[in-house]
Each structure stands twice: as structure tokens, then as C-alpha cells.
Amino acid sequence: MAEELKRSIPLLPLRGLLVYPTMVLHLDVGRDKSVQALEQAMMHDHMIFLATQQDISIDEPGEDEIFTVGTYTKIKQMLKLPNGTIRVLVEGLKRAHIVKYNEHEDYTSVDIQLIHEDDSKDTEDEALMRTLLDHFDQYIKISKKISAETYAAVTDIEEPGRMADIVASHLPLKLKDKQDILETADVKDRLNKVIDFINNEKEVLEIEKKIGQRVKRSMERTQKEYYLREQMKAIQKELGDKEGKTGEVQTLTEKIEEAGMPDHVKETALKELNRYEKIPSSSAESSVIRNYIDWLVALPWTDETDDKLDLKEAGRLLDEEHHGLEKVKERILEYLAVQKLTKSLKGPILCLAGPPGVGKTSLAKSIAKSLGRKFVRISLGGVRDESEIRGHRRTYVGAMPGRIIQGMKKAGKLNPVFLLDEIDKMSSDFRGDPSSAMLEVLDPEQNSSFSDHYIEETFDLSKVLFIATANNLATIPGPLRDRMEIINIAGYTEIEKLEIVKDHLLPKQIKEHGLKKSNLQLRDQAILDIIRYYTREAGVRSLERQLAAICRKAAKAIVAEERKRITVTEKNLQDFIGKRIFRYGQAETEDQVGVVTGLAYTTVGGDTLSIEVSLSPGKGKLILTGKLGDVMRESAQAAFSYVRSKTEELGIEPDFHEKYDIHIHVPEGAVPKDGPSAGITMATALVSALTGRAVSREVGMTGEITLRGRVLPIGGLKEKALGAHRAGLTTIIAPKDNEKDIEDIPESVREGLTFILASHLDEVLEHALVGEKK
């Protein structure tokens, strides 16, 4: 047997198949290196070497992952398909084994030695060929998957080696067995191996036929699914598997015993298990019962997490991850203290209410961490179906427990911190009211025996620390709101945001963008400018996005320009994040008649709000512009009526309403405005315009007015004071009843403001109006 060396033949690794000599077949080629190997072969003599991978899951096999014996092959035809792959028609020529691998830039070639075989045959070869044909004929008759034409073509083959290869290619052999035949160079050995493989396949087919006949006798013709299951039974019987469900039932029994269920739940589980054992596996009810038992054993009936009762450590963890939010932190530490003393306190039900981005969800995670408990979160936004909370009854196809029970299974503990995110976004429709279903979950007197429609057994939720989050408390139904302890989280002040950026957000973004602390420095004034002019929010989400934009610019400068340190100041800030997006109200530059600076409270914090009054000849018509809401319009009417009733005391012409039309305008007319807190501001502007006395530019005011001139309390004084301080005002006139709210204002802001607390409009006018009547 002589061998011939061929050098630098492009290599095409095959996955899950191989090619014997004289075989002609199509191949679809898509891997880049394989495509390049084909291109190289087509540019030269159209010859390529096909070798099979040992593991089909590998995309780029190495030398040790390819069988060394393959087929020296000629490419007959090549076609590029629209999807980028290539379809080739190849013809196997000779066996060969790899001598050396040659790695090129985008493909691999090999040096191979052709394995020549003797085509002559002796009497033993003739006998083996006849035996092979006889067994192949029997195999075809049993399998009925190979055509008579194929058998006829095989009988015409004269070469014994070629006959063995062709027959082997038609057998459903494992890849390693086909490779074994390819590697067998001796023709007699190859014929014997193929005969052995055929005999083995015949035995397998006979057993399959026997199983099929046994099943067919015991089934109805129309029950196709039943036939398949009976066939599986027959296979198990043939293998001697008589165990059935016994082992499975034993395992489930042990799980039920170890689950720590209450006695009544355990009794139900064992009863269902008894039903499961008796019902055939082919029954649809069988899988329903099994799924139910799996849920029962997976729930944490008694398994609890031991609380970390170290108040100092818990406080440190909360302070480390969140700036401010003192009320929430204090409430958690109070809970821990009582838990340490009593050892058996029911979990509180808290609702963190506040605008987006102030850290409600992340605070809940920190609370779980400080307590050492598991954390579970479910989003209730858009939930409309009561079954989402309580689950579906098992009579429905595909029934599942509700989100509460699913969350408890996920936690794996009886006392997790359970976050009910966006509880104010639930709504109801024809499928029920999920907020009503939440009443039982969030009632400390009832949730120790919570009942899910799917589980149908009571489950104790009393040890769970439920934390709900909401943006708008007004959309939460009253009974549900009454069950929760509301903790309002106001927006952060500029100073708080500055500290959050320096302590939390900036270090986080620097790390996420692959920078070092020494690479990027933001000056405090630059951070304040970002807060004031590039974000308008109560929280810090947009602020974090702007910091991320700065970090990206810095990363580009460091990589592309090889700079070591980037410093961002208020002067070069626009180079990083562009022009300013927002502007806040500013104090007036001079005292003016009929122009008063009011204070407004929005969802993104406090701001100033100018109110202008103009007189024009007319018949006392009151004109209101600036996209004012109904409440604000009524405040203007009340202020107007009060001024008309007090003309003598205020030094105004009694018949002014017969001479002038009065126009009250609030600038930024595209922005909707509403609320009663601009009452004293409008009244002051009216008096200023009618008396000709200017209003101090340094004064901002807020308060509701009555027809008797009383000044009533308002909300959001803290945020309004922050807006006034930012705008450069020095004096704030506020209702006397809001005195208690002043202590909530940061000390750094209080120091720069003078607060005048008024209970009547006379006090407001005394401090707001300057100069003499004109």
C-alpha cells in the first residue's frame, strides 16, 4: 500500500457528517475560515481536504479537535446563496491522513498523505461482498427506509472497498462508527465491520418492530397520543423498568415531610399525592396535581432569616448607600429596636411616596441589606386583573399562583423585604380590582392567613416587611392607603444633590466607564450648573445621565487624545454636554408696580412665578391669562372681590371697577398653572397696580387668601424656599400656620432668607409694598 504526499491542501472541517471516497453530495458552508478555504481551492486545482470535527459544538476547532483521517475531495460546483452561505457539490476521491497543519491568515491548509487501497479482489473478498449484500437486503426489507434503486446500485459495484463505503453511508450509524470505517484502510477489515454494524442495526429494528406490534394490539386506532405513551411503556417493559411512579412518589413524600407545612396543609398535600399516584401519567390531571404539589413543597412555610439587630451597623449601611431620607431611616431603626426588645413584631407596611428618581426602589433594597433579609420586587404598574395578585383557580388550564405567592417562592424565606413597586399604577377592569385584592395582603390583622386561589391553603404573610412605592397617593384607593404607613420622600435640594453626586453618582459613573478617580474632576460649581440648567427633576436620574455623558466625553479624550486628567468647570461645561436646557425664574432687577414674585411648587421642586397686573380704560372687566386652572382663577376672583370690598382702607378709588378693565397675567403661558397658593400674590399685585405703589423686588410670597383677607396655609414651603433662594430673593412672606414647616428647610438656605409670617393680607402689604402712592 503506497502513499503519496500532497502539500498545502485547504482544510474544510465538517460538523456531524463525513464523506467517503466516491461519494457525491452537497454541503452548505457558512463559517468564515471554511468559506476562505473553498475560495482558495477554487483559485487553484479545486481540490480540498474534508475532515470531521470530534465535537460539533465548536465553531473554530483546533488540531486536536479534528479527526486525522479524512477524504481528499474535488469540488464539482460552487454556488453562493443570498444568506451569505455557500453551497458546494463535492466528490470524494481518496482516503488520506493529515501530516501537518499550516495556519494562514484566514484559513487552514494541511499536508496529507493519500492512502491507496488495492482494488483487486480474491475469493474471500467475493464471499464478504455477497454476505454484505445479503444482510443489506434484509436490513432494507425491515427498515423500509432505503429504496430498491439504492440496493440495485450497490449490487453493481465491483470494488469491495467502495461497496463497504457506500453501504456504510446508508446506515444510521454514530459519527464515531462512521469515522472508524473511514479509518479502516484494509478492505477485508472494512467489509467485516460494515457487516457487524448491519447485523446490530437489524437487531435494533427487530426489537422496535416487536415493541410496535405489542402496543398496536392494545390501543384504539384513533388515539394517537395514547399509542405514543403505550409505546413508551412497552420500551420500559423491554428494558425491565417496572418501577413506575413508586420512586417519584417516595421522593415527593419526603419533600412534603421536610417542608415544614402546617398540619392542615400537609394533609392536603398527602391527599393530592395519593391521587397523583393512582392517576395514569397519560391523564392531563396528573400534570396538574404534580405542579400543585411542587408549589406546596417549594414555599417557605417556616424557614426564616435571622434579622441583623445591630442598630449602628444598620444605620451605617443606610447612610452609606443613601444621602438624606432621615425619616425613612429613622422608621427602620425604630422597627429594629422594637424587634430586638419584643422578638415577635409583625412586619410594618410602609409606603414610600415621592416623585420619580428620588431613590424609593433602591432604598428598599438597602433596607433589606441592612436587615440581612432576602429582597423580592414585583411591579404593579399596569396590573388590571385580580388574579395577578390572588392567582387562578386550578380548574383553569395553565393556572398559576398570584404574584405574592410567586414572590414568596422566589425569596425562599418567610420574612423577606417585599417591594410592591408602583402601587399607585394599578387599575381595574371587567376582570376585577387588584387593589381590592391587595387589601388582604396589606392588612396586618388578616395577612397571617392569606389565601391564594391556586394554593387554596392559608399562607402567613405577617412576618413579611412590605414596602410599597408610589408617585401619586391620590390614585391609591382610600381603604388601601389607610392600611399603609405613608412616608413622604420630597425631592432633593441642590445641596443634597451636590453631595449625592460627589459621594455616590460620580464615583459610580467613573467606575462604569473604566475611568480612574484621578482621570476626571468636576468642580462644585459645574455640578450645580448641571443641576440647575441641564436637569429639572426632584430626583437624580437625569442628573446621572448627564454625568454619564461627561464620563463618555472624558473617556474619549483620554483614549483618543491621550490626556491624563480632565477637569470640568462651569466655563467648559458646555463642551461636554452642550447648551443649557432649562432656566429657572430670577428675582426682578428693580421694584415695579403691578409685578409681584410668587412662589410655586411643582413635581420637580420649587420655582418663582411672576404675576403681572395691568389696568386699561374699561368697565371693570377681569381678564385672566397664562393658562390658569380653575382653582387659580377662583383665587384671582377672591383677591379681586377682597380689593373691591376694602377700597377705602387700601386707599383705592371706590369706583375703579367702573373706569378700568383689570388684566392679570402669569408669564410662560404655555405651561399649565393651578392651585390656591397664589392668592396673596394676586391680591398684592392688584393693590400695587391700583395704588401705584411698587413691590419690593427682594420679596417672594405664597399663601391662599379668603374674602375676609385671611392668609391660609399652603404646601411645599420647603421646595418654594429653595426656589426663592436659588432665584436670589432675600425675603419670603408665608402663612402664619406654616411656621412649623420652616424647620424642614435646610439650615444653609434658612440663613440666607428672612421669613415673614402673615395671618392677614394687611401684614403682607405692609412688608411687600414700598414707596408712596402715585
From Swiss-Prot:
Pfam families, A to Z: AAA, Lon_C, Lon_lid, LON_substr_bdg
Molecular function GO labels: ATP binding; ATP hydrolysis activity; ATP-dependent peptidase activity; sequence-specific DNA binding; serine-type endopeptidase activity
Active site per UniProt: 677, 720
Limits of the Lon proteolytic domain? 590-771
Q: Which UniProt keywords apply?
A: ATP-binding, Cytoplasm, Hydrolase, Nucleotide-binding, Protease, Serine protease, Stress response
Segments crossing the lipid bilayer: none
Task: Supply the InterPro entries for this chain.
Answer: AAA+_ATPase, ATPase_AAA_core, Lon_bac, Lon_bac/euk-typ, Lon_lid, Lon_proteolytic, Lon_Prtase, Lon_prtase_N
Q: Which family does it belong to?
A: Belongs to the peptidase S16 family.
Subunit comment: Homohexamer. Organized in a ring with a central cavity. Exists as a mixture of small oligomeric species in solution.
Stated name of the protein: Lon protease 1
Which species? Bacillus subtilis (strain 168)
What gene, per UniProt, encodes this protein? lon1
